[in-house]
């Protein structure tokens, strides 16, 4: 049986989910497939045959660090892999990165739109350097965001700048490299040793384009991700299986690459 690891999901404490999901639905004019609760994600995983999910939290203000870290500790298990978050404007951001590693987590999630930064600005580089030094994986929202004005704060050129400046950083460019900037992903990123997750992208791309993009990229640097609850995990698996990839490549994307990456961050 193929190991499946969803490297890009979201969930919230129950009381937060009840507020957050309707607000996010309104901002992005999208409908969630789940209610944002952890129990619903696990039920979805069971239905889709997904063994593990990475939960990507986002600290939208410095004061959220402690509560996100605490909740992440509470929910982690052999199937749930939380990636906590810190806010770059926190006065002790460097110490918070160290605390995430000290608590035993494998990675961190950041989001330029929700956290008010440009991907390659100078103030971010010491933070990325610390993340790299701690051996943490950095899952970064890249490309535009459906809920925000289309400002170019996380485009492929900026991704490449970060990778060049911090060469040891385990950086995952989400949404197939950069959401809704896929022509630039093709031009600038494909073929380079940069991790791409496939979240919230396959249903928006023509099948042949998605297949060609996957085949143009190093097969060890592709990760399955759904962006649940904003897509159905089962539907994204079906979309991937419909691309006609080899069984060996599909196994790497579904879980083999993720398992190797996570093992290296333990």
Predicted regions and their residues:
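H/E-rich (His + Asp/Glu) clusters that bind or coordinate divalent metals
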Residues: 176-266
